[in-house]
Design a protein with these regions (language model features):
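HotDog/MaoC-like acyl-thioester-processing domains
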Residues: 1-12, 99-150
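Catalytic strand-loop segment that frames the active site of acyl-thioester-processing enzymes
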Residues: 2-59, 73-74
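Generic structural detector for well-ordered beta-strands
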Residues: 18-23, 94, 146-148
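A generic structural signal for short beta-strands and their flanking turns/coil linkers
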Residues: 20, 28, 84-91, 124-128
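Hydrophobic beta-strand-centered segment that forms part of the acyl-chain substrate-binding groove
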Residues: 53-56, 66-111
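Core FKBP-type peptidyl-prolyl cis-trans isomerase
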Residues: 62-65, 123
């Protein structure tokens, strides 16, 4: 049995956190389109989107999710980062509001469930409610993320 502290053991249902903010930039949208191959006019055609219900181009939903996971990673301590064994997945993903170039997002989380694991790598899984909010305090993305921790 290890005497090292366990991040999993210290994680409790109801734990909450809020990350710092991050502004979604023109470069983010352009680079994400290139990396993902998603050149949909929603993200790339300013003239077309100016006449749409959104009034301007919107950021890719998965770009916002990716930026949110980055903010969550940056918010972890070195010990918490070392304790991450695997990212298991995302459930109940919803895009609540559009995110525009220039919007600043932050992530709010609450631990919903911890589940011990008897075998294999890691001590257990943590299921977390995740809400991405913009500078107007609107929820733009919501989901549940599950992570395997030591």
């Amino acid at each position: 049995m290890s005497d090292e502290p366990s991040v999993f053991a210290d994680t409790e249902e109801g734990d909450t956190a809020v990350t710092q903010g991050r502004t979604i930039t023109e470069a983010d949208v352009t680079n994400f389109a290139g990396v993902s191959g998603d050149f949909n006019h929603l993200h790339t055609d300013a003239e077309h989107m100016g006449e749409s219900m959104f009034g301007e181009r919107i950021a890719h939903g998965m770009l916002v999710v990716s930026a949110a996971t980055g903010l969550l990673w940056q918010a972890r301590s070195p010990e918490e980062r070392e304790a991450v064994v695997a990212f298991y997945g995302i459930d109940d993903l919803r895009f609540r509001q559009p995110t525009y170039v220039g919007d600043t997002i932050r992530v709010e989380t609450e631990v919903l469930e911890t589940r011990s694991k008897d075998e294999g790598p890691g001590n257990g899984t943590v299921r977390t409610a995740v809400e991405v909010r913009n500078q107007r305090d609107q929820a733009v993305v919501s989901c549940e993320m599950t992570t395997l921790l030591r």
